[in-house]
Amino acid sequence: MKRIKKLLMRGILPMGVMAAGCGMAAAYDDVLKTPLERNSCMVGEHQFMLLQPNVADLVIVTTDSLPGPEEPGVLLRVAAAFTGDDLRSVCGDHVVAGELRRGYDDVTCTGHLLAVGTRVSIRPNSDLDASVATAVKGGGYLFQQCLIVEDGVGRVERIPQAIRDREAHIIYRAACIMNDGSFAVIQGIDKMYCHEFIDGLVKLGVQQALYLDMGTWAYGWYREHNGDPIVELAPHFDNTRYQSNWLVVRSCY
């Protein structure tokens, strides 16, 4: 309920949720029963999808081993860091289950996601060395990407110029820490310019946001309950087969 009220205070109306009375409470209570909560919101002329883990024992991991829909407990799978021109290497050093793995250097890596146990944070790369040490020591996970919202401020200049120069013909997705400290993956449902996407994140109450690999690498999926059929988040393009690493929300039970 608190998330819905905060959105309404900003003039952002969740799609399919009544804006007054018991109708809003009933609709939101139904959502709260799912391990992975999905909400759709209009921000200006554009529609956004928010996917948020809803119970404390869900974990966020990154992996370079492709998790399939048949794997028990996987609720969300999306591409994470950029893949290199060789279609194998991962952009930036990263940590998988406490193991440091070297990636190629790139100036676009301005931030990182750190996940240890059920704790997730998104930080600037000025903290990278300390975060890598924490991930290795705690058996955790880390990957690097463009930090496109930092401390509630949009930083569109951190998206590669080649992406910024495109017309509004692709969708965008980001891993986010909200103002209340919760984690979310937020995706634009319709096509927009990257600055429109980042402005929308800020209006939705995002404190920190890390870009996720998109374009023809955008394929991913989610489900609200363990064992449900998957809901695809983007078309399966030819480049999907070259995805090299993934951000995964996994249930502990």
For each feature predicted by the language model, list its residue ranges:
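N-terminal secretory signal peptides that target proteins for export/translocation
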Residues: M1-K6
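Gly/Ser/Thr/Pro-rich low-complexity, intrinsically disordered segments
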Residues: L8, G23-Y253
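Bacterial N-terminal signal peptides
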Residues: G11-A20
